[in-house]
Swiss-Prot record:
Entry keywords, A to Z: Chloroplast, Oxidoreductase, Phosphoprotein, Plastid, Thylakoid, Transit peptide
Native source species: Arabidopsis thaliana (Mouse-ear cress)
PANTHER family named among the record's database cross-references: THYLAKOID LUMENAL 29 KDA PROTEIN, CHLOROPLASTIC (PTHR31356:SF34), THYLAKOID LUMENAL 29 KDA PROTEIN, CHLOROPLASTIC-RELATED (PTHR31356)
InterPro entries: Ccp1-like (IPR044831), Haem_peroxidase (IPR002016), Haem_peroxidase_sf (IPR010255), Peroxidase_I (IPR002207)
Residues bearing PTM Phosphoserine: 155
Name assigned to this protein: Thylakoid lumenal 29 kDa protein, chloroplastic
Top-rank lineage group of the source organism: Eukaryota
Main location: plastid
EC number: 1.-.-.-
GO cellular component term, pick one: chloroplast
Subcellular location: Plastid, Chloroplast thylakoid lumen
CDD domains in the record: plant_peroxidase_like
GO function terms (MF aspect): heme binding; peroxidase activity
Length: 349
């Protein structure tokens, strides 16, 4: 039987039987990509090797089945991987919506950037390595913790986060976002805002050119691990007192001691200077009095004077990513939801 063609890619079945052959058409100018099943002369006397309709249907059915497997619709070997891909897509889409809303909200209230940075820092800095308690768990939302001296002036930043959370929760298909997650994501958006603001300043205040500069030379591609660590759980009560310094009153040694206690150090203290208070220049002036911190302060100041400020941005992202996960076991299935499955038994070929 001749003249049966498959325009889609079909796997080779030449080994399934010793009397079926696939031949490709050729011409004087080119070789066709169309695969054709052709009748050939029998090599064993008395044996008919013609393709029957059932053979063609078998090939077509196999091709459709393999395509369904490739697309994750078969409930067998690839099912777990398909589910994992669906969950990644759902989480990524949800996170993108949060980031867009945070970016828009922060752009309208840039004066809250220092508050958002310190909220992210202080929520995480309650981590105690010895007891493995505290950390980036959203406990700063409790009034008994927010009212502490080290958190003075952060209530407006938390109010902004509450507003965004309320809107995000109203559209979430996978449950409400945790305070732990949205506090750190707000910190991330605040950091990005400072990066973009710096690029705009370097372009003489031209927002369009600043956006182009940040897009071309910025560090957006360095946030991968931070974004993946999405699924923090919330504390059910305030963290213990006395774990976070009053950054505006602490000595450099006290600041170093706290950073070291959570697994960071002088380098991270220097690069995260913007998190310690609203006046980064004044903070860095103080930090530069310490011989261990001073070289790093100078390094990042030089970096911020460059067009791309790569060293500063990349090192800050690295330090912030580590800080944002203190005390957490990330739930990589958070914010996912079941999707409707295709019932293959109802499909007719």
């Amino acid at each position: 039987m001749g003249g049966v063609s498959f325009l889609s890619t079909v796997p080779s079945f030449t080994n399934t039987t010793n009397h079926q052959h696939l031949t490709t058409l050729s011409s004087s100018s080119h070789r066709s990509a169309v695969i054709r099943c052709s009748k050939i002369e029998p090599q064993v006397s008395g044996e008919s090797l013609a393709f029957h309709r059932r053979d063609v249907l078998k090939l077509a059915g196999t091709a459709v089945g393999m395509e369904l497997i490739g697309n994750g619709f078969i409930n067998n070997v690839g099912d777990a991987k398909a589910a994992d891909l669906n969950q990644r897509r759902q989480r990524s889409e949800f996170q993108s919506k949060i980031k867009i809303l945070l970016s828009t909200t922060i752009k309208a209230k840039p004066e809250l950037v220092p508050s958002l940075l310190k909220l992210a820092l202080n929520d995480a800095m309650t981590y105690d390595k010895a007891t493995k308690s505290g950390g980036a768990n959203g406990s700063i939302r409790f009034s008994s913790e927010l009212s502490r001296a080290e958190n003075e002036g952060l209530s407006d930043g938390l109010s902004l986060i509450e507003e965004v959370k309320k809107e995000i929760d109203s559209i979430s298909k996978g449950g409400p976002i945790s305070y732990a997650d949205i506090i750190q994501l707000a910190g991330q958006s605040a950091v990005k805002f400072t990066y973009l603001a710096s690029a705009i300043r370097k372009c003489g205040g031209n927002e369009e050119k600043g956006n182009l500069l940040y897009t071309a030379y910025g560090s957006a591609g360095q946030w991968g691990l931070f974004d993946r660590n999405f699924g923090r759980s919330d504390a059910t009560e305030a963290d213990p007192e006395g774990r976070v310094p009053q950054w505006g009153k602490a000595t450099v040694q006290e600041m170093k001691d706290k950073f070291i206690a959570v697994g960071l150090g002088p380098r991270q203290l220097a690069v995260m200077s913007a998190f310690l208070g609203p006046d980064q220049a004044a903070t860095e002036q103080l930090l530069a009095t310490d011989p261990q911190v001073a070289p790093w302060v100078q390094k990042y100041q030089r970096s911020r004077e460059t067009v791309s400020q790569t060293d500063y941005e990349v090192d800050l992202i690295t330090a912030f990513t580590k800080l944002s996960c203190l005390g957490q076991q990330i739930n990589f299935e958070a914010y996912t939801y079941p999707v409707e499955r295709i019932n293959l038994s109802k499909l007719k070929l």
